[in-house]
């Protein structure tokens, strides 16, 4: 079992119960899923780009991503409906906890010029979204094997009712928020 999952059960959950005065353990916010999304607009011109993005995403997430396609044709971007324009992965369960552990302990500290995560990235319902500019911050990506540096979106969906609960939950996992 992942180290962070044990930490959630043993320390984070009881701390949140006392902090927010929950009457039941089931009211305590928990992380439901983590979604990784990589937009690959260049895939319209070159099909190989999508293969590289899928390979990188598979290495990072530990499971095969789903190719996302354009819903509408947009002449300005030279895309047609049904064109592959990105890929995404939804992590739940054990893989989610393992990814979260790698994100907090290894990937975030490797971000260049890092000054803390923005607190403004909560959506009002306790979910947190962050962007990563380089996929090379993850240890699974070998620097000499990548064709291009790509970024990705990471969305952490929680069962928190508001941003305060969501932030307290993520701070319990040592997320480095700006002060």
UniProtKB/Swiss-Prot annotation:
Assigned keywords, A-Z: Ribonucleoprotein, Ribosomal protein, RNA-binding, rRNA-binding, tRNA-binding
UniProt-listed Pfam families: Ribosomal_L5, Ribosomal_L5_C
Gene Ontology terms: cellular component: ribonucleoprotein complex; ribosome
Domain of life: Bacteria
A single GO BP: translation
Keyword Repressor: no
GO molecular function: rRNA binding; structural constituent of ribosome; tRNA binding
Matching SUPFAM superfamilies: RL5-like
Subunit structure as annotated in this protein's UniProt entry: Part of the 50S ribosomal subunit; part of the 5S rRNA/L5/L18/L25 subcomplex. Contacts the 5S rRNA and the P site tRNA. Forms a bridge to the 30S subunit in the 70S ribosome.
Protein family (similarity comment): Belongs to the universal ribosomal protein uL5 family.
Purpose: This is one of the proteins that bind and probably mediate the attachment of the 5S RNA into the large ribosomal subunit, where it forms part of the central protuberance. In the 70S ribosome it contacts protein S13 of the 30S subunit (bridge B1b), connecting the 2 subunits; this bridge is implicated in subunit movement. Contacts the P site tRNA; the 5S rRNA and some of its associated proteins might help stabilize positioning of ribosome-bound tRNAs.
Name of this protein: Large ribosomal subunit protein uL5
Organism encoding this protein: Shewanella pealeana (strain ATCC 700345 / ANG-SQ1)
Gene: rplE
């Amino acid at each position: 079992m992942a180290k962070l999952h044990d930490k959630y059960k043993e320390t984070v959950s009881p701390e949140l119960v006392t902090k927010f005065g929950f009457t039941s353990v089931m009211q305590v916010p928990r992380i439901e899923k983590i979604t990784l999304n990589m937009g690959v607009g260049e895939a319209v011109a070159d099909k190989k780009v999508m293969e590289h993005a899928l390979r990188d995403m598979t290495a990072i997430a530990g499971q095969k991503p789903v190719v996302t396609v354009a819903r509408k044709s947009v002449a300005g971007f030279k895309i047609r409906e049904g064109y592959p324009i990105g890929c995404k992965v939804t992590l739940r369960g054990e893989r989610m906890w393992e990814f979260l552990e790698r994100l907090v302990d290894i990937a975030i500290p490797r971000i260049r010029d890092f000054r803390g995560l923005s607190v403004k990235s909560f959506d009002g319902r306790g979910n947190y979204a962050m962007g990563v500019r380089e996929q090379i911050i993850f240890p699974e990506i070998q620097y000499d094997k990548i064709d291009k540096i790509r970024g990705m979106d990471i969305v952490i969906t929680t069962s928190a009712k508001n941003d305060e609960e969501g932030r307290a939950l993520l701070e319990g996992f040592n997320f480095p928020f700006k002060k």
